[in-house]
């Protein structure tokens, strides 16, 4: 079983050195090959033959690798790079496609596993409708990977023996397409009956494409107690489209576990479930900043990045409270944002503790961070530019950081707004901006924006709060 230790999938921060070895010179010391090969010494003859075989084999391998890369790029999924293929940054990842773009589909708040008695339209039929949303969105987009950004399940209703079957169901559309994916976990994935570490292990070892290759990048790179650290804290490197089998590092995708929910298989003295803090732990933030700085130092430059976390940071609520113009942040704005750092009593009366301040500070200080993407709040799906000081928030100024919400993707969970997924497209030649939109279940597009230096000032059409049909 994979252990949850710091650096489980850590990069090697050393430059790859050349391998020394004897070089054979095919010179005039040996008579012309065509007529006098047999006159050469046995050692030299073997050297010539060996060099020919090695050269031919390497040529075939390189050509085959290029063919596989082009074929994978053509069908959508970016090729997976294994250890030893990432140039000076030796860490498995994905790469920009042949069209020099990297496209991510994000599904959030799928909430599989809710029983029929929880409400009208819930139960197994709702789960299959959720899978239908995923299929519809993926059929409309040409994605290189999928991010499942938390609350894959409503696991408070799921028996322990059924957890892996739920994960199989939610990843079925990805298996069908041989689609690489990564997950963060949400507060509804952490319950007394469900362990997100069991989910992660199942994804890692058992979710494979139709070609038999593993699809999941979901892992844990930070050690510590489950209720403090969570599970889904890790990163994925995205390599350049050029460079054959030795491309350079172009971008990083960061994943964070904001926890929440209930502790696994634990109860208090009264037999009640034990709540788990709903924010990214400071130890995880320290791992992030140390790893980020080490990568940048090793590469000798700032590596652009994206980040994914289920529960949004408090800055989103502070921004919402400032009542921004809907034409500068197009999207649903149908509920008050629930965010990291809230502490709630037994009657669900909550107050902000500031516990995500260290995490927000680290995000703001991360050069090249193009955007942070969250779910959790089913009635919000806009992107904000954190360029001005926000009251009652620390840090006050976000240095232009983009914070985005995903669309509620599942028919489980609350809300009746139209379901969909967020699409994120980054161009290899424009690693300072993002193009993003919501692809709705019916195939239409909502809230198409460009997150660049003028986002937050540019004006876009407002987004209609459309409802899902058949509820």
Task: Mark where each language-model region is.
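Fungal secretory targeting signals
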Residues: 55, 61-79
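N-terminal active-site segment of His-dependent metallophosphoesterases
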Residues: 76-170
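Binuclear metal-dependent phosphoesterase catalytic core
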Residues: 80, 238, 253, 380-471
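Extended active-site neighborhood of metal-dependent phosphoesterases/phosphodiesterases
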Residues: 80-96, 166-300
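Active-site-proximal beta-strand elements of phosphoester/diester hydrolases
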Residues: 101-114, 250-260, 264, 308, ...
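Active-site environment of divalent metal-dependent phosphoester hydrolases
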Residues: 113-116, 154-157, 183-195, 262-264, ...
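His/acidic metal-ligating clusters that form di-metal
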Residues: 141-144, 252-255, 267-381
